[in-house]
Amino acid sequence: MPKLHVPIARIVAAVLALLTVVPLLVSSGPPAGAEPAGQAGAPTETFGQRPLRVASFNIHHGVGTDNLLDLERIARVIEDGGAQVVGLQEVDRHFGERSQFVDQATWLAERLGMRVVFGANLDLDPFTPDAPRRQYGTAILSRHRIRGWRNTLLPRPAGGEQRGLLEAVVSVRGARVRVFNTHLQHNSQEERLAQIAQIRTIVGQSRESVVLLGDLNATPESPEIAAITEDLADTWVAAGEGEGFTYDAETPHARIDYVLTSSDVVAKAAAVVTSDGSDHLPVVVDLVLPGGRFGRR
């Protein structure tokens, strides 16, 4: 498995301050704003509970149903949804003309005042030697501190698109939750099953409570979802109403975007948000995390 990204300065500071070793992730992704005390529309916290609103959103590199690139529109959808942690799929980073070579992950983080980590599943040479690398993948936005992160490349046969599993340990008012974000292969069940198998292995190693966000490109009755829900709970089944279709945005007919959690996380409400900002609709879920610094053990 790939190593975690952990800046040395943060470790040294922690050792000097505490004279001990913290046996977990001890870093954050690049901050893009201070952690707020609260947010309008976010779930209300009561004593002993740690509510967390999360969302999964395939943003189609900012191109909406009108075929127009409009990243501000994506930002407004996220903002209006009130999610404190958001998993984004199909995110460009200096990728090309289709997204005007913008680092979309950083742009959205700065626009929303959130922290961000980005997982590059495609990492291509620039068109000119002095330009940034052209990248495409997934991102996690968070209003809470990100203490560490990594991106794992998933199985890919020859000729297939490289997919990945981005994960971040997020500190939510003293509790840690491990947030995963993925986007599985769209045209091969065999590939998705192989990718799900590796995801289950990685998720199963988590000491913390787990939230898996993503465009899984599989419907609820599929073998892929049957496999992953042996380990994680489908929050739409627990807290959603209706079919929960997320694709496509113009004529929703399939539920392929998910929020899945470990059994110690409670889903209180789930909704699909109407939007024309992408070809997918975002799914937003209110969760309650368990107490304790590290969640499950």
What is each of the regions a protein language model found here?
Residues I59-V63, V91-F95, N121-P126, I146-R147, ...:
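Solvent-exposed loop/turn segments at secondary-structure junctions
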Residues W107-R115, S171, I202, E224-D231:
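Alpha-helical structural signal in soluble globular domains
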